[in-house]
From Swiss-Prot:
The keyword DNA-binding applies. GO terms for molecular function: DNA binding. It comes from Helicobacter pylori (strain J99 / ATCC 700824) (Campylobacter pylori J99). Keywords: Chromosome partition, DNA-binding. The gene is parB. The keyword DNA-binding applies. One of its GO terms (biological process) is chromosome segregation. Belongs to the ParB family. SUPFAM superfamilies: KorB DNA-binding domain-like, ParB/Sulfiredoxin. One of its GO terms (cellular component) is chromosome. This is Probable chromosome-partitioning protein ParB.
Length: 290
């Protein structure tokens, strides 16, 4: 199946087009900048970014109040109305600052290009949430039937970077929402990739509730994998010849976790405990010695 053309030119050509507007100072020309009523500008319906930091918007709104909007938004005119194609955050902050008007550059752009311009602007943002970036990558890959290798060249990132970001989309919806809401970092999220959904969400609760670091999360995920491989001979964790029944070990493990945030792993005739909070380990040791 032939690949879709990106508006007859190719996706790679769109990137320098956006940069041309902002980097070559074209917006300084009087015939390119207009002052539009804030309510005349309609949001881009194809904007892939759904969540914006309230604190960040407040800071930008205050800056706009004091210094004005330094970089105009990009809009396209259609039937007497203006549709935003780049600058969603600036538009929201200007509304928050109760500005009656907003500086804009009216560009001659086909309507179907609005989505890809929004996607590209999104990808180029430094503060973009990793999951939003993954979704933007996915939309570009699917819309234009390109490979990850081709996309990596366009966005000037390694293929490994694109692949790793895309793997975040395999996480459970609960984990994805936590990442979007910045309850966990991308480092935490990457540790959970590949785990069963139930284990992902169990570890997620621990990350949030216990404020685990990425390293602690890696240790916890490793323990879950070890416990799942108890019957694997090559790891030496076969339980059939131990004196502890599997259900007894499971109850013991659950009790340890509930009370002391400890995990127990059975290695031959030894039980190895892993601790995730020093204060609780001290409480456990005092209990054992009392």
């Amino acid at each position: 199946m032939a690949k879709n053309k990106v508006l007859g030119r190719g996706l790679a050509d769109i990137f320098p087009e956006i940069n041309e507007v902002y980097e070559q100072g074209l917006y300084e020309r009087a015939n390119r900048v207009v002052e539009l009523g804030i309510d005349e500008v309609m949001p881009n319906p194809y904007q892939p970014r759904k969540i914006f930091s309230e604190d960040s918007l407040e800071e930008l709104a205050q800056s706009i109040k004091e210094h004005g909007l330094l970089q105009p938004v990009l809009v396209v005119s259609e039937n007497g109305r203006y549709h935003l194609i780049a600058g969603e955050r600036r538009l929201r902050a200007s509304k928050l600052a109760k500005m009656p008007t907003i500086k804009a550059i009216v560009v001659d752009i086909e309507q179907e290009k609005m989505r890809e311009v929004a996607l590209i602007e999104n990808i180029q943002r430094e503060d973009l949430n990793p999951l939003e970036l993954a979704r933007s990558y996915k939309e570009l890959l699917e819309s234009y039937q390109m490979t990850q290798e081709e996309l990596s060249k366009i966005v000037k990132k390694s293929r490994a970077h694109v692949a790793n970001i895309m793997r975040l989309l395999t996480l459970s919806s609960k984990v994805q929402n936590a990442l979007l809401e910045e309850k966990i970092t991308s480092g935490h999220a990457k540790v959970l990739v590949g785990l069963e959904e139930e284990k992902q969400e169990l570890i997620l609760n621990s990350i949030i509730g216990q404020k685990l670091s990425v390293r602690q999360t890696e240790d916890l995920a490793r323990d879950f994998k070890i416990n799942a491989n108890f019957d694997n001979k090559k790891h030496g964790f076969k339980q059939t010849q131990t004196l502890i029944a599997e259900d007894e070990l499971e109850r013991f493990n659950q009790s340890l976790w509930d009370r002391y945030k400890l995990k127990a792993a059975l290695k031959g005739k030894k039980i190895v405990l892993r601790c995730y909070k020093n204060s609780l380990l001290e409480a456990f040791m005092k209990k054992m010695m009392s």
